[in-house]
Each structure stands twice: as C-alpha cells, then as structure tokens.
Amino acid sequence: MSSMEKNVLIRNALIANYNNYAQGIDTKDWSMVRDCFADDVFIDYGALSASTGDPALPREADDWVKHLQSVINGFDITQHMITNHRFCISSTAVSCRAYLSADHVIFANTEVPVVADEDVITVVGEYNNHYSEIDGEWKICKSELVVHWSHGNAELFVEATERALAQLKSQK
C-alpha cells in the first residue's frame, strides 16, 4: 500500500472516530463514546474539564466518559456537529483538528419540542485530537477543546448536571 493510500485510510478512520464520538454523545450511547478513546487519555477542555483533573496528567477514559455522562444525561437532546477536519499525519504522530458546534437543550415542555433562547446553550470551538493506533483502530489518546464562544443559557450546564444526578439517584 502506498503512503498516500495509507493516509487516506487514516483520514477516513479519524473522521469516523469524530462521527462516532458525536453520535455517541447525541444518542447517549456511552459505549460508543468510550470506544473512541485509548484506555488512558489526556483531556483539556479548558473550564469544561477543569474539575476533572490536571490536563497534563493522563486519566482513565472510563472516568472521562462517566464525567461526560454526568452532564450530557441531564439534557433532553444534544446535537454535536464536527466539521472541517485538518489532518497532520507523519511517521511519528497522527492528529486532527476539527470545528465543533454543539447545541445542548432542556425543553420547557418535552411534548412540544420548540426551543426558546433560555432552553439552549450552543458551544462553538475547535477540537485538536491526537491518536494512537491500538489493535488496528485509531483511538484518541489526547483531546483538547478550545471554546471560541457560546451562545444561550449557560446555566443549563448546571441544571443538566443536577438533572443527571437526580436521574442516577432515582435508578438506585
């Protein structure tokens, strides 16, 4: 296989990884999200991950996915769109930058899925993921998110976390 063919396969695998991550979050398929990561991962999402540990230290991917669940499960619906993939593929490293636009919604009335300004927080930014090939699959070993801006009701993250915690307690 030529290096160009190999690079195309890697690019396709990285895009699939981003797509699986977004789909997993939006459908709350946490095993799909977990499959996107190596067992140990460096996470730096700025303020969004600050409470989960030092971004310079690796953490267990299982713990990171549990943290995502503790927020996302409290939203009625999310939509993560990841686009404009830019690849860096060399003999020693594989990474990909991509734009993010993510809507996070708590409906005032779930029977009428109309979103008012106070029902949504949109986060716009850029991922920079670094990958390792593990058992023939490309997995995220380092993920950075730089938030460029957000629009909407930022308090929804607090409300979603409280709702997710209440859901967890009611299941016990």
Regions found by a protein language model. Name each.
Residues 1-39:
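Short, low-complexity N-terminal intrinsically disordered segments enriched in polar/charged residues
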Residues 6, 11, 62-65, 97, ...:
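Generic N-terminal initiation segments characterized by hydrophobic and/or small/turn-forming residues
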Residues 10, 14, 26, 57, ...:
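Aromatic-acidic/polar surface patches that form glycan- and anion
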Residues 32-106:
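A solvent-exposed, acidic/Ser-Thr-rich amphipathic alpha-helical stretch
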Residues 73-84, 88-172:
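A beta-strand edge to alpha-helix "cap/lid" segment located at domain peripheries
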